[in-house]
Amino acid sequence: VSSSYRSIRAAVDGGRLHGGEWNASGATTVVAVHGITANHRTFAPLAEALPQHRLLAPDLRGRGASRTLPGPWGIDRHAEDVARLITASGGGPVVLVGHSMGGFVAAALVRRFPDLVSGLVLVDGGLPFPPPPEGVDVDQAIAQTLGPALQRLRRTFPSREAYQRFWRAHPALHEAWSEAVADYVDYDLVGNPPELRSSVSSQAVSQDARDQYQDPDTADLLGGFTGPARLLVVSRGLLGQPPGLYPEEELVRWRRRLPSLPIDEVPQLNHYTIILHPSGAARVAAAVCTLS
């Protein structure tokens, strides 16, 4: 962990939301929100890429050190928690970054608490998914999308090394393994050998997943938020292969519906490496710098 890092916490309904802070003396505050089965350490490479920015990142309710916070979960509940963290950490406005499900949380936050946010960067997330086809329920759809990331929640691991091997074999990460990825993975483990497990609540994942499906033609993405915003999307998905999470026809639809939201397509990177690889973190950092 970087020498500029420290643990943080903020009071929320039901207990304390935990997370981390990097570069505390930075002039501009960035708040970064992680994905559905992730934790705040996913943003360590972004902190390295933004040495002049103070970066705050929570473990969302039901994940990491916030795993014991009670439900209900859901996108709006997470948005309320992150708003509490912003207020407890000096107040806004901040530049808000949301990756994957964190993009949905970030979009909900700017709709509900626009005064807390000066700029918004969505990273391969935040645009609602069309409801699953008839005969496919949300749990099936999310299992197909997340693959190994969801499967691990039902498993135990005999050692930290075994968990590292599981993640090293992940098709989106095996060529991008680094100290930062190893730290992110290790932080996720709770319990004791030989029954180590992920900190992520499968109940939280199931409830949060439902909030990501909505008819895109009726979705109110940013509400009355008038600050600068942009979306980065990658060409490869959660298993490291094309296509990305958002098909081209969905991007065309959103460019037409929301011309005020520039959409930048990032080649070569996948849903994980856009955040965890230095080249991906650099692209996100560049987007942050255009808004701050």
What are these regions (language model features)?
Residues L60-V97:
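Active-site loop/oxyanion-hole signature of alpha/beta-hydrolase fold enzymes
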Residues G92-V136:
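Conserved hydrolase catalytic core segment
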Residues R154-D208:
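Conserved alpha/beta-hydrolase catalytic His-Asp/Glu region
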